[in-house]
């Protein structure tokens, strides 16, 4: 986690005021690798996605009924991993083990994977879960605001990532496995492409991490939120997606860029839509000057139009009692291996 580097930003509200009146507010927040314990209630939108009582992925509450997470948490869209009856969502949770006095649990009504999710490239690694019933907001359970279309997160933008993932590669959190928080700066897409291998990072991704290493999300943090603060409001910029190892020098973590998915998210949520906030970094972006062999020059203007179609994941009945657990971790990019091992 990184010490704060606050950036002056402006914001405009793009959705009806109801969800904006509560989203992104963390009344108990006074301020995963290289991180520290998060005080109870600091990140009230953080959820744990569990199967058979076991933590699989993180996620974020975006309104009273919907959770935003990563598509790769459900590696096979026709089998065990996407049978909604096997999943539970834990909200208001602080520890994976031990006491959680502010926790509530909900069943899952529906799982929706982005129709253009590519498990090979990790592009469009984003998914939505609908809860079985609406939650009641408390100081420990609240929705996060989402970055609206055309939001700008310049290289260096201060961000926080939360989760219950490993504290080092292969090392689990110690008992009672308390939610961790880590502060990391955004790494621009051009520089991130140069570091991970040109072509690895798409416009649907956003990177963050220290180039010296030591602070990062890691396995088990998948699907969890990366947020930045704008005034008194926290805005989610990314969803934990993939990386090569954890907290390694010059290998920032990669996240799904939330602002590219506003139309897709709203197409699934017909009422009580999430609070989308336009996040605009001030000043020029230093990433525009990043260059390396094979990287094209920066365009004068880049726009992204996410697809509008939807995919409803099948919900097969199953009586299998013992099946292998899917990876359920922040995944490694196959393109990274290709670029670095075969070129």
Predicted regions mapped to residue ranges:
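Gly/Ser-enriched beta-turn/beta-hairpin loop segments
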Residues: 37, 96-103, 120-123, 138, ...
